[in-house]
Amino acid sequence: MQKGCLHSICISPQRGQLKQEVPEALVTDFGIENDGHAGDWGRQVTCLNWESVQQVNKEKNMNIGPGQFAENLLIEGLDLKQLKVGGRLKIGADVILEVSQIGKEDHPSVVTRTLGVTLLPYEGLFCRVVAGGSIKKGDAVEEVQ
C-alpha cells in the first residue's frame, strides 16, 4: 500500500471560492469543519497530488499554491491516480476517506477564471468521510483496505 504525507489543508466558507490554507482541521461525518463543501453528499472532501500542482507550476511558469485549485487536501508522495472509486485513505491517527468520484465536469469556475488552468476535473479525488477526527499539516497519509 502507498504512503505519503498531508502537504496542506484548505477550506473556504462557501462553494465557488478559492480555498485558504489552515494548519489543522477537524473532519466530521460530513466533511471538513468550516468548509463550504461539507454536507451530506459524496463530494465532502477533495484531494489533489501536490506533485501535480508543482508540474502545472513548472509547465505554465506559474506559482500556484495550496487551495488555489479549490482542493481541500494536497497529498504529497502518494500517487492518487492509482486509487479507484471505493479506495480508502487514512490520514493521521483516525480519519478515513473513501473515494466516491474521480474527476468532474470541466465547467467555467472560479479556478479557471482566476488561473486559466484547472486540475480537479481531471485528477481530483472526491471523497466521503468514513471516520472523522483531527488532521494537521504533515500527517501521514496511507492507502488502506
PLM regions: where:
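Metal-cofactor-dependent catalytic cores
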Residues: M1-Q145
